[in-house]
Amino acid sequence: MSKTILITGATDGIGLETAKKLLQQGHTILAHGRNEEKLNKLTKELATTGKIETYLADLSSKDAVLYLAKEVAKNHSSINVLINNAAVLKTDVVTTDGLDVRFVVNTLAPYLLTKKLLPLLKDSGRVINVASAAQASVNFHALSGKAITLTDMEAYSQSKLALIMWSTTMSKI
C-alpha cells in the first residue's frame, strides 16, 4: 500500500537517500528543504521515479515551521509518516529570536512540526526522528542558562540528546 511520507532535510544525505528508496517502493514523498535550488534539482532528479512534492522552509524559524505544517495540511488531509531528518551541525550560532540554531533545527522544529501534524497522522501514523550516535550526556552548566560557549559538536550532541529524550517520552503516550 502506497503511503504519503513527509521527509525534512530531503535534499542531502540520509534524507535524500531515504526519499529515493521510498519513491522506488511506490510511496508519495513530500520532500522538505531549506534551499530552493536543491529542491528544484531534487524534483528534476526524482520526478520520473515517482510522485514527489517539495516544500521550502527554513526550520530555524518558528514561523517557517508553522508555515510548512500549514502547507502540508492544505495539500493533504492525512499523511502516513513524518520523518524528522533535517539537522544542522556547523552554522551561525543564533537565530533571529536569540536561540541556538542547532537546538532549534535539531530539536524544537521537529517537536513543533510533529505537534502541528499529529491530526494528519491519524491512528496509524508514524513519526520517525533521526537522531545520532553523537548524542552526549547533559551539560548542566549549559542547561542552566549560564553564559558558556559550546563547540559545534557539543551543541549538536546536546540537541540530539534532547530529541531522543522527547522521542522516548512521546512513544509512551
Residue ranges with predicted function:
Residues 22:
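Aromatic pocket-lining residues of Rossmann-like dinucleotide-binding sites
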Residues 36-37, 55-70, 96:
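The beta1-alpha1 cofactor-binding region of Rossmann-like NAD(H)/NADP(H)-dependent oxidoreductases
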Residues 25-40:
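Conserved glycine-rich Rossmann-like NAD(P)H-binding loop of the short-chain dehydrogenase/reductase
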Residues 49-53, 71-84, 90-95:
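A glycine-rich helix->loop->beta "capping" turn
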Residues 9-13:
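Conserved glycine-rich cofactor-binding loop
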Residues 107-108:
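Ankyrin-repeat alpha-helix packing hotspot
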Residues 87-94, 123-173:
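Catalytic loop of short-chain dehydrogenase/reductase
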Residues 114-115, 168:
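A short, exposed helix-loop element centered on a Lys and neighboring polar residues
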